[in-house]
């Protein structure tokens, strides 16, 4: 069956018939192997959104595509914080296209912060593993099978995407953004010694119970939140694996990084240095 629609100017199909026909021969064998590897695991993807009307249809389509091709059980939880651009209305259309068993809408009335968005999402997650990632297409779902493979190789508590190892990298940033990111990562490595190469990235896979404990312990907001998550994971002796990823600057909308966020980052870094 093909479920399709036209959302936010993008034509979508949840499972194209051509893709299912390709699941023969080597494709079918590969999918069977991945299903066996997945066991009884289920993956909940948390997508906090704010003004992501144009990006949401494509990121959801890509997530559905790569999860369906891999054969892993999954759900996508959209946590919209009262976006004025109609993001929630688009999410409702996506729920109709793909089904309420795959697309779960858990909106909030206003913008309350990333940490509380994760707490809210975890409360509704039915998977034993949780992906966190940006909804603005900066994180490509094609890396999801790599995360799952890495986690199973070492039974890691956390698998973090890294832009600074192997084939990882950043595309679409100007020199200023690259210098800020590299500089922030360099300083945090010196001060905090976290045991991970990319502290400020936000594409990660957690065991659900691990994510719950980390979110409860973290007090930071904004861009420091992701950094504190890794630092606290190290403090609690959680194992951390890494997967090289390519980060691509958002396709639609404006970056939420500004001067206030940079100042907050520096304050948060000093706080973590003093308390860890």
Regions found by a protein language model. Give the residues of each.
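Hydrophobic helical membrane-anchoring modules
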Residues: 1-42, 146, 191-194, 217-276
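Hydrophobic targeting segments
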Residues: 41-47, 56, 63, 74-79, ...
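Short, well-formed alpha-helical segments that are part of the catalytic scaffolds
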Residues: 52-68
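Acidic helix N-cap motif at the loop->helix transition within catalytic regions
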Residues: 54-58, 85-94
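Conserved donor nucleotide-binding strand/loop of the catalytic core
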Residues: 74-77, 88-124
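A conserved acidic beta->alpha catalytic loop
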Residues: 80-88, 137
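Acceptor/aglycone-binding surface of glycosyltransferases and processive sugar-polymer synthases
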Residues: 106-124, 129, 141-223, 250-260, ...
């Amino acid at each position: 069956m093909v479920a399709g629609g036209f959302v936010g100017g993008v034509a979508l199909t949840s499972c194209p018939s051509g893709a299912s026909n390709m699941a023969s021969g080597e494709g079918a064998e590969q999918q069977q192997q991945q299903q066996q590897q997945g066991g009884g695991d289920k993956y909940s993807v948390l997508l906090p959104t704010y003004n992501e009307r144009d990006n949401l249809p494509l990121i959801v389509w890509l997530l559905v595509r790569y999860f369906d091709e891999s054969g892993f059980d999954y759900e996508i939880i959209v946590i919209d914080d009262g976006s004025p651009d109609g993001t929630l209305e688009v999410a409702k259309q996506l729920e109709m296209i793909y089904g309420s068993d795959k697309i779960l809408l858990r909106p909030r009335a206003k913008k309350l912060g990333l940490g509380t968005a994760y707490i809210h999402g975890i409360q509704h997650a039915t998977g034993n593993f949780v992906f966190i990632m940006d909804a603005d297409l900066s994180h490509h779902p094609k890396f999801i099978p790599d995360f799952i493979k890495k986690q199973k190789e070492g039974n890691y508590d956390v698998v973090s995407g890294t832009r600074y190892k192997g084939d990882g990298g950043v595309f679409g940033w100007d020199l200023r953004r690259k210098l800020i990111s590299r500089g922030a990562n360099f300083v945090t490595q010196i001060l905090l010694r976290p045991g991970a190469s990319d502290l400020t990235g936000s594409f990660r896979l957690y065991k659900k119970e691990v994510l719950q404990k980390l979110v409860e312990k973290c007090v930071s907001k904004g861009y420091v939140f992701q950094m504190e998550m890794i630092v606290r994971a190290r403090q609690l002796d959680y194992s951390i694996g890494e997967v090289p990823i390519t980060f691509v600057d958002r396709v639609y909308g404006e970056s939420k990084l500004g001067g206030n966020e940079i100042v907050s980052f520096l304050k948060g870094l000093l706080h973590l240095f003093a308390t860890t």
